[in-house]
Amino acid sequence: MAERANLVFQNKEIDGTAMKRLISRLIDHFGMGYTSHILDQIKTLGFHQATTTSISLGIEDLLTIPSKGWLVQDAEQQSFLLEKHYYYGAVHAVEKLRQSVEIWYATSEYLKHEMNSNFRITDPSNPVYLMSFSGARGNASQVHQLVGMRGLMADPQGQMIDLPIQSNLREGLSLTEYIISCYGARKGVVDTAVRTADAGYLTRRLVEVVQHIIVRRRDCGTIQAISVSPQNGMTEKLFVQTLIGRVLANDIYIGSRCIATRNQDIGIGLVNRFITTFRAQPFRAQPIYIRTPFTCRSTSWICQLCYGRSSTHGDLVELGEAVGVIAGQSIGEPGTQLTLRTFHTGGVFTGGTADLVRSPSNGKIQFNGDLVHPTRTRHGQPAFLCYIDLHITIQSQDILHSVTIPSKSLILVQNDQYVESEQVIAEIRAGTSALHFKEKVQKHIYSESDGEMHWSTDVYHAPEYQYGNLRRLPKTSHLWILSVSMCRSSIASFSLHKDQDQMNTYSFSVDGRYIFGLSMADDEVRHRLLDTFGKKDREILDYSTPDRIMSNGHWNFVYPSILQNNFDLLAKKRRNRFAIPLQYHQEQEKEPISCFGISIEIPFMGVLRRNTIVAYFDDPRYKKDKKGSGIVKFRYRTLEDEYRTREKDSENEYGSPENEYRTREEECKTLEDEYRTREEEYETLEDEYGIPENEYETLEDEYGILEDEYRTREEESEDEYGSPENKYRPREDKYGTLEEDSEDEHGTLEEDSEEDSEDEYGNPEEDSVLKKGVLIEHRGTKEFSLKYQKEVDRFFFILQELHILPRSSSLKVLDNSIIGVDTQLTKNTRSRLGGLVRVKRKKSHTELKIFSGDIHFPEEADKILGGSLIPLEREKKDSKESKKRENWVYVQWKKILKSKEKYFVLVRPAVAYEMNEGRNLATLFPQDLLQEEGNLQLRLVNFISHENSKLTQRIYHTNSQFVRTCLVLNWEQEEKEEARASLVEIRANGLIRDFLRIGLIKSTISYTRKRYDSRSAGLILHNRLDRTNTNSFYSKAKIQSLSQHQEAIGTLLNRNKEYQSLMVLSASNCSRIGFFKNSKNPNGVKESNPRIPIPKFWGLFRNFSGLLGTIAPSISNFSSSYYLLTYNQILLKKHLLLDNLKQNFKVLQGLKHSLINENQRTSNFDSNIMLDPFQLNWHFLPHDSWEETSAKIHLGQFICENVCLFKSHIKKSGQIFIVNIDSFVIRAAKPYLATTGATVHGHYGEILYKGDRLVTFIYEKARSSDITQGLPKVEQIFEARSIDSLSPNLERRIEDWNERIPRILGGPWGFLIGAELTIAQSRISLVNKIQKVYRSQGVQIHNRHIEIIIRQVTSKVRVSEDGMSNVFSPGELIGLLRAERAGRALDESIYYRAILLGITRVSLNTQSFISEASFQETARVLAKAALRGRIDWLKGLKENVVLGGIIPVGTGFQKFVHRYPQNKNLYFEIQKKKLFASEMRDILFLHTELVSSDSDVTNNFYETSESPFTPFI
């Protein structure tokens, strides 16, 4: 009893780790049998207690952590600050990503630690706590997800998802968090299914390689060893794990005393003596040489001493043990288990955090500033890097604290800075001890807005490749995206322009035609007109209907929604076109508003030639009636013929007087020629404003028209264009139809040869392609250029109908038959007209034409005029009917096929349209428009917009336009070949003006970009009284030169009149008013009259606030940024009520312009060339912040947001490009920080759109520490594949060693030693890499298991061709030991090189063909073995299993052992070889250098400590 009282009673909890230690000590003391008896009793006790306790889980047991709320709030605040820094351009995207990960990872980890203490303190008997922390079921990570927070998740590719899950499973997830969690669940399912199979297959291959490795002998007699030394950075834990269970290869001496002998196995006691000795005498410690499976001299088996102790019972491994199978299972099985582990954690992202050093108390910090170097942390924060251990003192009021910071750490505070308690002062560099995989990852940064790319001189302006757009960054610098207003669709030109924007003609690209106004009668499109003012200006309403409407209170228009979606595809070859929407009110109030507008066309670069059409509009009076199709006939002249005299008067042009029939053949031919089609190709403008998409779908679905089959252009197409049916309402023809008997009476009809054509549709143009479902361009529209305009006085419209039917459709009418209105043509088609039917069969479709009119059979054929237009007197009944002008008929020849002599005449009704030029002038354009001002001439011309005799057709609800009224520009000066035009839109508070500016000279205020495309700045103002006062920044001579070429300035929108107008003002009607410093209220004229708003006009007159490089100090009294634009005095009073305005002008002296570059150097330049301030978003700084700080800024300087240069912070980042006395203008820009080595996409000055790729970062990141990422790496190493992220390619290094070592040593020795060294080095490297994967997962695998596998992978050499051998053929794979023995047995040397084989190839290159055949490629292996006559000695396990024999392990091992007489003199032979070994060490000095210079895995215990491989001892 007394003895029992002396025992220590341990009364504490025990977890899984402590249980492992207890069992290990029990085995050491009592052996396996007694230990199992003790553990059985513990098991019984545990089950009994668990049964009586009956622990169950409830939701109340999941205790949440109280501190979670403020922890998450703190992390969110840090993330917000990080986002702000990124917006300012202080950190780049990779730093932002890293810091975001670490913020949330640190928060999650802190919560996990809090969870442990919370359970332990508040509820130690909590079932969740007991279950998970005792190791019974679950782990800390799963409980943390239940009661803490899930944190950052990884997607299926292993990449981190930026949005952390802040909730835990106890609280419940939001919808977003749930969806992100589903990624992890999916990842777990995929891993369980796929990766488990991978791990199982890996195990099978590993066992296949080493299944024949059996312990067959006690000692192989090797003299090789591997050295282990703790001096080179090996941790004590690794040192112990490496030595325990091994066998010594040499005697160990301390001084002259031997403490361990050769072939002695190392236990825990001996290891402790080694550690004690090394601690006492660290510099005198000798490396310990041990035996490993690498050093065993046997070929296909292993000896007891090279293997060491068995892992199961702690003694030397027994003979007959299948250590190969055990090794394969030991490596493969953790992969299977760890694969399943991810299913439970659900893809939660785990990262690594650096160790932080915190201040112990408040106080001032001090350190030696000479020992640190400024640097930038991984998160973009400024810091100091210390190269050696740094001593830091923190001096509080009464205590002096001293903290030692290890080398290569980051100091996060400045010297002499006051720090608070627990403040982070240093960060110990992560990676010194952590074993993480690194991988190179590309991160693409995309533009957040449209803009123009700009970079500093730090970027290589030459691209990486000759024609590429990729550039490398030599050092860290900023990229700037200068904001622009991109007009990718023309809608943007009306909706996205803000006040004080200035637009250029080049930016107006109307990619299609608009439908202006309102369509009341159409049921499909219902529009609402919103009257919006003020803040809601420029509002776009989106409806689910096909069209949309835009309104801003001043004007409105509707545009097809197809333009919004496909504006990139529209109009590739179209010039820039700018449409001004105008509403046209007819006199009748009852009729709906007719919608049409004046369209202004400005060509590319704004260059106008002579006789250019500047503007045009479509008169609704010349639109085709409602529904119907037909052809247009006219006699026309082109504009080029305008100045030629007319040969005939209008009466002679249009045929003979009424009731007069010419009979002479010459007159017939003359008349026919006048109305014959002119054979030029011009596509008809089917619809002026475009057709909604759904109409084309219907048309194509019904007829199956292919793109290339529609409108193949032929020169002789006449009367051929028709409309597809089912689109038009029937129109009654007053001529009726022919009698039925006339059809039988006449034979087959044939058209005249000149009317006959092979294909009537015309070729589609490039921009009129018809694709199913997508309207790329409005079919039939063509560039409305001067070449194709026909100026006519009268034209005729003749009804005709065309149907395009599929080839397979069955017609219900016959060719050349006469039908009536609404006759059924096919199953789903009915006719709209009555008349003669003509059918033509084409390769891909069938054309069916219906000619309306009467058929007459003349008695005398030669008296009939073919192709004539004849007026009919009987149709003139009264004046009302004559307005319709339906008093003409069109006569055509038709011939009967059966009887060549019989002819008949088809008389078709024609509608005549008269054009009166004088009527348009009063209503559309003011008369002063046609006055010659500034040598420019503008005149009105009516053009017909259809080809003669081409078929026009109505589609759906739109009306076809016959006549277009155009405004044609001309000038008298012959030396001027071109004019310049630009459009300017100005917006005031309640006023909008659009200006058209046309000038004969290049504008002096035109701005030239680097690409030399001239762009106009706006109006040039003139004042009749004193021209020198008008433009203060030009010299008098320059302005006088301008006045010689006066320009016409027209406003395109006039709200004062109820009808539309194109008003032209001379330049002298404009003036400007500037407010100066003596004005008390710069934003208003007088405080007593608050009704007067001062509009902020910057869009047009920015040049008055100082252009680029205006010398500011010279203009002392020019200060304000607000300007007022007046057109004339009447308009001024009417709109702005500025009667009380005191005209307070000061004469400003003219200045020369100068440019200030980025280095603040000034240079004068010609005022004709300036930089381009177009398409910019403006931001104004306070007026009072300029004078004091003029030296701080310069032109072109980039300023980041929130920089305190003045009294107030800069509110927006951008580039300074206009400098005034009291203010400067910043062009808004977004900075992006890019690091060294990043790749920049695009060119300098290139316009980028939102979403375009800007920069690509290449950075290293730690791989997700998930076994699903690590397991493939183990497989790749075993298969000897190249792994970029782990190290340089091992195979390449082996090739280098194979070449260099024989070259240095030379001769046969070189190959022998070179192969030995190469194999030894590669073995150590491979073991290190595999252990790194498993240790990162916390899995402990003994090195000997991996060494047995690697021994087989590296056991082959390839016979070289350098020395021919009679035994082996070049290229043959043989075992290393076999090659060495053959070399010693033969007189000649065998040359060979080391080779690295994967486990699959090794399995197929064994000594047993039965084992190979049972693994893979059975037929091939057996066939080759039969041809070679191979013999299988059945040494392995698989061969015997396949053949049903006894396997040579365990009890079956005795039958395969052949006893050899032991050589008693072996030890003395080893002693005799000592001399040889010392000589070899001198030769192999290179080996140690090779190993130590290997930079594969630094700070790794294998690379640094076990590497001195000594082949002879």
UniProtKB/Swiss-Prot annotation:
Pfam families from the UniProt entry: RNA_pol_Rpb1_4, RNA_pol_Rpb1_5
A GO BP annotation: DNA-templated transcription
Co-factor requirement: Zn(2+)
KW Translocase (keyword) present: no
Bias kind Acidic residues: ranges: 680-707, 738-767
Reactions the enzyme catalyzes: RNA(n) + a ribonucleoside 5'-triphosphate = RNA(n+1) + diphosphate
Keywords linked to the UniProt accession: Chloroplast, DNA-directed RNA polymerase, Metal-binding, Nucleotidyltransferase, Plastid, Transcription, Transferase, Zinc
CC terms in the record's Gene Ontology section: chloroplast; DNA-directed RNA polymerase complex; mitochondrion; plastid
Chain positions recorded as Zn(2+) binding sites: 220, 296, 303, 306
The protein's enzyme class: transferase
InterPro entries per the UniProt record, alphabetical: DNA-dir_RpoC2_beta_pp (IPR012756), RNA_pol_beta''_euk (IPR050254), RNA_pol_Rpb1_3_sf (IPR042102), RNA_pol_Rpb1_4 (IPR007083), RNA_pol_Rpb1_5 (IPR007081), Rpb1_funnel_sf (IPR038120)
Ranges for region Disordered: 644-769
Cofactor note: Binds 1 Zn(2+) ion per subunit.
Subcellular location, record wording: Plastid, Chloroplast
Top-rank taxon, per record: Eukaryota
GO MF annotation: an example: zinc ion binding
Enzyme Commission (EC) number: 2.7.7.6
Basic and acidic residues bias (residue ranges): 659-679, 726-737
Main location: plastid
Similarity-based family: Belongs to the RNA polymerase beta' chain family. RpoC2 subfamily.
Matching HAMAP family: RNApol_bact_RpoC2 (MF_01324)
Subunit-structure text: In plastids the minimal PEP RNA polymerase catalytic core is composed of four subunits: alpha, beta, beta', and beta''. When a (nuclear-encoded) sigma factor is associated with the core the holoenzyme is formed, which can initiate transcription.
Stated role: DNA-dependent RNA polymerase catalyzes the transcription of DNA into RNA using the four ribonucleoside triphosphates as substrates.
Protein name listed in UniProt: DNA-directed RNA polymerase subunit beta''
Species: Oryza sativa subsp. japonica (Rice)
Gene behind this protein: rpoC2
